[in-house]
Amino acid sequence: IAALHEGGVEMETILPSLRTIPQIEGRMERIEEGQPFNIIVDFAHTPDGLEQIFKFASSITPKEKRIIAVFGSAGKRDTKKRPIFGQLADKYCDLIILTEDDPRDEDPLQIAEEIASGIAKTNRILIESRYDAIRQAIEVANVGDTILILGKGDENFIYREFGREPWMSDPAAVRDILRRYYFEPEEEEDHETAE
């Protein structure tokens, strides 16, 4: 926008064109499947990225409703940021569900504990399986709440000790869970690596 405007294009010309720009999957992606609460998937995986999405969620969530965050931290990356992630979530969220996010050869629950060390007051749950963590968030959400699924965006893999493992992607997991368990509850199945 700034480059176009600096190049002489009037804002009145630029702004209407923004409506035709397609959504970038996994970046501030709202999942709308008819559920009575907000679900936003975002790639945020840095302190600044998390704070920005938390602030946005605060701006769209009524004061009496909850912000529920599902996220983790990548293994073998920026370990000193983990407590900071917890502090930021503690400041903005009402429920924090910590889960795996590219653990590589680290224990996902140990990573979650390091994030949790920055959480002072907010209720938190540790669920290793990313699919199950997303499902838990959807199951506990109430009308008007906002769920944030953070860290992986639309990536369709999870880095583990042995390399890349297929992952359905966060947007696909949300839609699958809504369809299977929220709108049409079915028996338990394992959907960890479904595509």
What spans do the regions from the language model cover?
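ATP-dependent carboxylate-amine ligase
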Residues: A2-E195
